[in-house]
Amino acid sequence: MSREALAKKIFCIGVDGMDPRLTRKYVDEGKMPNVKKLIERGACRHDLAMVGAMPTVTPPMWTTLATGAYPGTHGITCFYRATEEPDVIAYNFDSRNCKAEPLWNVFAESGKKTLVWH
């Protein structure tokens, strides 16, 4: 694939709990050659850190990445949420609870091909 064709594609890899400092260390030591190739051919922060949202727990962080919106906008702020029933909580990591549009839907609506694999 040509460099120009690659420039028109987005490939995002996210690994929950992957320490960017250790990843950078192992890449620099040659222990992660395939990750090094992806870094060299793409665009990323040098320190590999994700500029995220608060709180720094899984549901709001992944939803922020998926939507480009902060937790106050997309509504996913923790693992659980209150329900209408007293003393009942529900798992909150569910797209039906998200108030913002995922980026892949935005891209698809503008005629772009998208693929999401979880």
Q: What residue ranges belong to the model's regions?
A:
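Active-site nucleophile/metal-coordination loop of metallo-enzymes that catalyze phosphate/sulfate
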Residues: 2-9, 17-117
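Generic enzyme active-site microenvironment
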Residues: 14
